[in-house]
Amino acid sequence: MRILRVDPSDAATVRACYEVQTAAAQAEDPLGPPKTVRFLRAFLAEGFEANPCESWAAFSAGTDMTAHGWYWLELPDRENLDRATLIIVVRPRPDHAVGRDLLRHAGQRARANGRTILSLMARQGSPLEAFLHSAGARHVYTEARRALDLRTAAPGHFTALREAAARHAAGYSLITWSGVTPERHLGDVARLENAMNDAPREAGVEDSVWDADRVRERHDSSVLRMGVRAYSVAAVHDATGELAALTQLEVDPDSPEWGHQGMTAVDRPHRGHRLGLLVKAAMLDWLADAEPQLEQVETGNADANEHMISINEALGFRILDPSWTWLELPVTTLLDNTVLDKDVLAAGEH
């Protein structure tokens, strides 16, 4: 087996990785939103926030360019320089050694880039989770993915929720924009990104520090690069004119029946006014006109984030699939563990 660096500009290699992605999703995630070739190409190149990253794929020996699996390794360059985030995708049970060898290779690449900890996810109760624990990973927290089926939502449901929330939000007004962040809001969006540091995460993870330049260079550039239709709804504090809350959602034009929830944040001084529910309900009202073909919206929440879960459930989100486990794996532990010499890593996606 050959493990080769993925060139995201090489259409044939990206297509080979996409075929792996599709096969894995059909086996493990048949209810979830489909990924598109264009989205995967952009993701392999720069991930979600344009952090440095690299991707590698496993091919058969010889000249056969059928991929059996691939991984994506994110290497943050502003905070958490000791960490790397890893995603591995392999075909359903082609050969247990594929996932094992990709994991070992990813550990070697992480170490070569000065990283000492891998952060990764696995389905709770899956063979992958069991394998990662046997390789030395420790559980950090769990999260579940939820979906909102707009086809079954009662008429007027989101409007009623928005109006009910607005009664607790005197002194705030709603604004919207599509596409990249307007220049005048860059600083406020950065402040709300910093408010996301309150969300559950691994112990020892450093706060992300956002400013206007980072919003433009990392978030907005990702919107443009991936070619998604991006929507933002914000609550403005009337007395100061500052943004107090923000929710964002994206629609892939190649898969327009699904919406993908981005960040939802309420700045600390403005919490307690139901602004989270207000902006999210307003978003869904807006999309009924802006994206009439939209059928479902997906989101994910850490189990500990009870407040956001309660908002999503009020909107109508329901569990889409079992909980996922976030794990932390020291690179040295991974590479020194003899369990990697055994054919025990089941195929699938994480």
What is each stretch, according to the model?
Residues M1-E46, A164-R214, T338-V339, V344-H350:
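Short amphipathic alpha-helix that is part of the acyltransferase structural core
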Residues V6-P8, Q21-Q124, V236-D238, A244-D267, ...:
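Conserved donor-binding loop and adjoining core beta-sheet/short helix segment
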Residues R91-P92, S119-L128, D267-R271, Q296-I309, ...:
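Conserved beta-strand-loop-alpha-helix junction that forms the acyl-donor binding cleft
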Residues P92-R184, S323-E328:
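Acyl-donor-binding surface of acyltransferase catalytic domains
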Residues D95-Q108, S134, V266, G272-W286, ...:
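Conserved acetyl-CoA-binding loop-helix of GNAT-fold acetyltransferases
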Residues A135-A154, Y231, D285-N337, D341-H350:
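Active-site/acyl-donor-binding loops of N-acyltransferases
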Residues R167-A170, R184, M226-A230, A244:
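Short gly/pro-enriched beta-turn/loop segments at secondary-structure junctions
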Residues A199-E202, A212-V233, L243, E250, ...:
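Amphipathic alpha-helical hairpins
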